[in-house]
Amino acid sequence: MAAVPTGTLFSVATTFGSNITVTAVTNANPAVCTATAHGLSNGDIIEVTSGWGRANKRVFRVANVTANTFELEGFDTSSTSFFPAGTGTGTVREVTAWTQLSKVMNPSTKGGEPKTVVYKFVESDVEYSINDGFTATSYTLEFDDDDTTAGYTAMRTLTDAQTNTVMKMLMRSGAILYLPCTLAMNDVPRLQDGQINRISASFAGVNRHTRYSA
């Protein structure tokens, strides 16, 4: 069904829990993590640090919790080619607080496109191409130039710290997108005749986004 951006809410993670050690991760759909007395609950949002490059710094929703295990909802690690058995251990940390970014304007994104490598053999007059992963994803948002909002304060802090955070985009349909990222705010006001003064912030993805349907 067609959708429009109106009503979309943006937030950033401003507080994380302590690192939780993960001692095993299954090759399954979805992946099941073992972490003794982890204390997580169904629906919690976590950032993963893992020996698997395709999982490292990704963000997932927790599901089917037991005392010592939990699932990474929607994350398929069945392939031992992409996820070598026994090497996905690491840590997770829960997002414990979000700050909404208010007065957002003109959201834009770039990256995420497939990368291709073009090559040719000497004996052939035809070029070939193969896929080689994806370009880095980033978002840019503009905001009303209002330094009294909680979102401005959060972005200022994250810009100064340059630590990893998570951008959450809650669409009007109820679908949610999580992008692990670093944030950099340009708080020099942009003045334009006939427009309100505005600032901007860029969210540089550190791995692929995760999306959950409504």
Model regions and ranges:
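Small/polar beta-strand repeat architecture
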Residues: 2-7, 14-29, 35-38, 52-125
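Oligomerization/assembly interface segments of phage tail-like spikes and tubes
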Residues: 128-147, 195-210
